Amino acid sequence: MTLFILTETSAGYALLKAKDKKLLKRDDLSTETATPEGVSNLLKLKSFQKFDSAATALEEVASLVEGKVTPRLAGLLDEIKDEKKVSLAVADPKLGNAIGKLPGLDIQLVADSTTTDIYRAIREHLPTLIPGLLPQDMSTMSLGLSHSLARHKLKFSPDKIDTMIVQAIALLDDLDKELNNYAMRVKEWYGWHFPELAKILNDNIAYAKLVLKMGMRSNFESADLAEILPEEIEGAVKAAADRSMGTEISQEDLENIQALAEQVVGFSEYRQQLASYLTARMNAIAPNLTALVGELVGARLIAHAGSLTNLSKSPASTLQILGAEKALFRALKTKHDTPKYGLIYHASLIGQATGKNKGKMARVLAAKASLGLRVDALAEWDDDVTEEDKAALGTEARFNLERKLAAMEGKPLKPRGVAIAPNGTPAQPKKFDINEARKYNADADAMVDDEPKSAKKQKKLVEEVQDEEMADANGASDSDSSEEESSKKSKKGKSDLEKMAEKAGLSVKRYQRKLERGEIEFDAEGNPTAVSKKDLKKAKKEAKKASKGDDKKRKRSDEGEGVDNAEKKKKKKKKDE
């Protein structure tokens, strides 16, 4: 059987013919192919089909990597179609299976470990087998093709867009931390010059914009703050600037403070831009997951799993506790209850649920999210499909979950398509609101001796004597007096309880409970002491044992008295006789 060897190079396809039909079964193959002369004695070139350009080479090699037979390769194999009893050695088993499926090609394919030595020799001595191919040109073409193939793989990688989401959500979290640190630093720094501003203005971004706009607090009269602040807060800021107790700063200090304030404003604007970019990316890549859990929670789930494909392979139970691995393994180690939710806890549907319903909603939401993820990762859509059609599964599942949650919680249904905030209310588009900071209410202060003298009770020099009604005249007085006595007794009882509880070293409520259960004992002086349940049980057991012993003694004494009485009766009878 004639043996042909298919060789793919960066220059083109080469079809080699073995001079020995049993070449692959030889034991001395590695020694025979060690030199170029030995390889040329064993193999000869049957046909060589050169690539026209670097782009053609990239297309051909990319198809070979995926295990596909190109028309150029099929045309090369047509040359051996008419020969009888032919075997073809192929380096890639996947490519060998694809060649075997070609119609009209009756060839025995060899794609196993027996071809390893012969292919190693061909790659090492390829310029000697193909005439006109220089080693320098071969190395240059191989390097260029490898770079092009790497760029092609990176361009069409299914995980490349996931990387954008992972990086965006990580950057968003970092921006929040840095923005908070920078804003606090601006307040502390500018607070030396204008400390009252932080008490009046609560918003960090508005504070930074105000520092940039006003500069020194002495410029409050000429500065137009209407673009930043509402009228009432603007008036409060200007009034505070007029009578501020802050220290004076130099122009150089102000320039550095304003430079930091510019960073705060710039970071806040970029954060808004990044958040909108992340929302658009999530709606394009994982529309069903975004419809169910939101873009931020969905992005954190994808970042935690590494990619959308990895996340779609996870079952619903893994998706439910993703992000709570430490708590899970700690619970398994200590044999405690495992956590019910991880990152998915921050989804708005779970935020609406209360109590035990949170765990139920987490379980159901994870199940629906896992189905939506598989659609997002594996579905192949046509170009004319709209975004609403892609997210139809997630939107319908969210509507059903909202209806189920409303039935469990007993709340009215939210309108369909309305985003729901974690507190259960429909989420409105965010607005730039400036709220005045909380201030200390000085009017709420109260002192004991602050009352005016006129308000204090003064002793009357002459007391008026009023007529007292007789008890028989009005029966209501008896009831009033009885009520007063009962209230006095209750007050005395409360005070006594508090004293006894202090002596026992317990709170009043605990003292009352133990007193009702009989767990309080009193000594000879009447001081209470708390007794534990174990001590009470031991005392009861000892009392039972003691009572049993007394009963036995009584029985014995009764038996002895009965014997004595019988003897006395016998003696009396004898005397009478």
From Swiss-Prot:
Where in the sequence does UniProt note compositional bias of the Basic residues kind?
A: 568-577
Q: Which UniProt keywords apply?
A: Nucleus, Ribonucleoprotein, Ribosome biogenesis, rRNA processing
Pfam families associated with the record: Nop, NOP5NT
- Which Gene Ontology BP annotations are present? box C/D sno(s)RNA 3'-end processing; endonucleolytic cleavage in 5'-ETS of tricistronic rRNA transcript (SSU-rRNA, 5.8S rRNA, LSU-rRNA); endonucleolytic cleavage in ITS1 to separate SSU-rRNA from 5.8S rRNA and LSU-rRNA from tricistronic rRNA transcript (SSU-rRNA, 5.8S rRNA, LSU-rRNA); endonucleolytic cleavage to generate mature 5'-end of SSU-rRNA from (SSU-rRNA, 5.8S rRNA, LSU-rRNA); protein localization to nucleolus; snoRNA guided rRNA 2'-O-methylation
State where composition is biased (Basic and acidic residues).
Answer: 485-502, 544-559
One GO cellular component, as annotated: nucleolus
Chain residue ranges for the region called Disordered: 445-577
Quote one Gene Ontology molecular function term: snoRNA binding
Q: Where in the cell is it found?
A: Nucleus, Nucleolus
Q: Which Gene3D superfamilies match?
A: 1.10.287.4070, Nop domain
Source domain of life? Eukaryota
Q: Where is the Nop domain?
A: 285-410
Protein purpose: Required for pre-18S rRNA processing. May bind microtubules.
Q: Which family does it belong to?
A: Belongs to the NOP5/NOP56 family.
Q: Report what the protein is called.
A: Nucleolar protein 58
Q: Source species, please? A: Aspergillus terreus (strain NIH 2624 / FGSC A1156)
Lineage summary: Eukaryota, Fungi, Dikarya, Ascomycota, Pezizomycotina
